[in-house]
Amino acid sequence: MLVYQKTKAEFLDDVLSNQVEVIIQDLVLKKLGRKTGQSEINSWRNSMMYMNNVLVDTHIPSDSGVSIEYQLPYAGLRIDFVLTGQDEQGADKAIIIELKQWSEAAATDKDGVVSTYLGKGLQEVNHPSYQAWSYAAYLNGFNETVYTDGIKLLPCAYLHNHPDNGVLTSGHYADYVAKAPLFLKSDALKLREFIRQHVRHGDKSGIMYRIDGGRIRPSKQLADSLASMMKGNQEFILLDE
């Protein structure tokens, strides 16, 4: 379900008004019937300021689409931020951006899992790149509009408070960072360049509206993967917040 859906220009105006977190909060209540805690409101305020800084760039079209808090159908999960538009050849692109407030994290010996301080203490959670990639994999596997219309999903993660200390980009997590690039505190310009590379023109085809209206139906690729998994090959993707 779409919650916040506007153009880049409108998003920048919402941030400039110092009301973006209130606007998102009101839309979450209106469309999802859910009240929001203060910590989540604060995270919206902070993260959207950082995304504003990245997107204030004339090379990123003002009519590209911005979706915030997109609800994955039947998954009970949400995508923090999606930027949509067309590339140089006119192909539809949707950049999925997982946003984190983390300022520190530690590696674990588990596949795709890190530990960080959340709420009451240290918790094990999915690596942000794994998380972003899993959302794209879900849509690629189940959303008929995505796989029939050839919409290219580009997952990544932006940890705007986390220093580049090598923990999250270590070899242990290299496979997931390759699938969903990780941008850290000092990487705002790199994220901007990543967006520039893939979104050269505005969203002319209502990409997120089409995705949101897409029928949930397993793709042939997913069916083949499930068949492979039943034969003993590991192709299972864990979805988790």
Feature map (PLM): residue ranges:
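Accessory nucleic-acid engagement/destabilization modules that flank
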Residues: 1-213
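Pre-Walker A segment
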Residues: 191-241
